[in-house]
Amino acid sequence: MDLHHYVQDIPDFPKPGILFRDISPMLRDPVGWAEVMDRLGVLCDSLKPDLIVGIEARGFIVGMGLATHKKLGFVPVRKPGKLPGKVYGIDYALEYGTDRLEIHADAMRGQPRILVVDDLLATGGTASATADLVKQAGGQLVGCAFIVELTELKGRGRLPGDIQVESLIHYS
């Protein structure tokens, strides 16, 4: 099944000159969404993660779907100030400025094997920061998975070289 037709191109969003790749049509279609979960499930079968980590916000949708599909636990990585209790945090560079991500300090008990998921891999900044955060929290990062990858932005190159990185749809 070709998943490209489940992605809608939205020009000039969120600002002029940006072509946004929207997975909303995929989320609305039970057949397309099931195909995504099945394909990511095959990756889970090979990597054998203990937990799925999803990056705010659409990574929550992908991550919870996959965690439920494979009967695994889910850990959210959030923007600052959104998680109660003790957290680990990491600051990372954006095109203009910096941002911060946080994870519960007790989320990685027992050094679990972690698969990080998100809807999109672009420059790799957020995914790379999440990979570092997982390691800081004590997790063993085994892979990253994305629905869409914008290959021309070379985000894959910013991710650790010792993990498996998979994307279901590639745009160049």
Curated annotation (Swiss-Prot):
<dbReference type="InterPro" id="IPR029057">
    <property type="entry name" value="PRTase-like"/>
</dbReference>
<keyword id="KW-0808">Transferase</keyword>
<dbReference type="InterPro" id="IPR050054">
    <property type="entry name" value="UPRTase/APRTase"/>
</dbReference>
<keyword id="KW-0963">Cytoplasm</keyword>
<dbReference type="InterPro" id="IPR005764">
    <property type="entry name" value="Ade_phspho_trans"/>
</dbReference>
<comment type="similarity">
    <text>Belongs to the purine/pyrimidine phosphoribosyltransferase family.</text>
</comment>
<dbReference type="GO" id="GO:0016208">
    <property type="term" value="F:AMP binding"/>
</dbReference>
<comment type="pathway">
    <text>Purine metabolism; AMP biosynthesis via salvage pathway; AMP from adenine: step 1/1.</text>
</comment>
<protein>
    <recommendedName>
        <fullName>Adenine phosphoribosyltransferase</fullName>
        <ecNumber>2.4.2.7</ecNumber>
    </recommendedName>
</protein>
<dbReference type="GO" id="GO:0044209">
    <property type="term" value="P:AMP salvage"/>
</dbReference>
<dbReference type="GO" id="GO:0003999">
    <property type="term" value="F:adenine phosphoribosyltransferase activity"/>
</dbReference>
<keyword id="KW-0660">Purine salvage</keyword>
<dbReference type="GO" id="GO:0006168">
    <property type="term" value="P:adenine salvage"/>
</dbReference>
<comment type="function">
    <text>Catalyzes a salvage reaction resulting in the formation of AMP, that is energically less costly than de novo synthesis.</text>
</comment>
<comment type="subunit">
    <text>Homodimer.</text>
</comment>
<dbReference type="GO" id="GO:0005737">
    <property type="term" value="C:cytoplasm"/>
</dbReference>
<dbReference type="InterPro" id="IPR000836">
    <property type="entry name" value="PRibTrfase_dom"/>
</dbReference>
<keyword id="KW-0328">Glycosyltransferase</keyword>
<dbReference type="Pfam" id="PF00156">
    <property type="entry name" value="Pribosyltran"/>
</dbReference>
<dbReference type="GO" id="GO:0002055">
    <property type="term" value="F:adenine binding"/>
</dbReference>
<dbReference type="GO" id="GO:0006166">
    <property type="term" value="P:purine ribonucleoside salvage"/>
</dbReference>
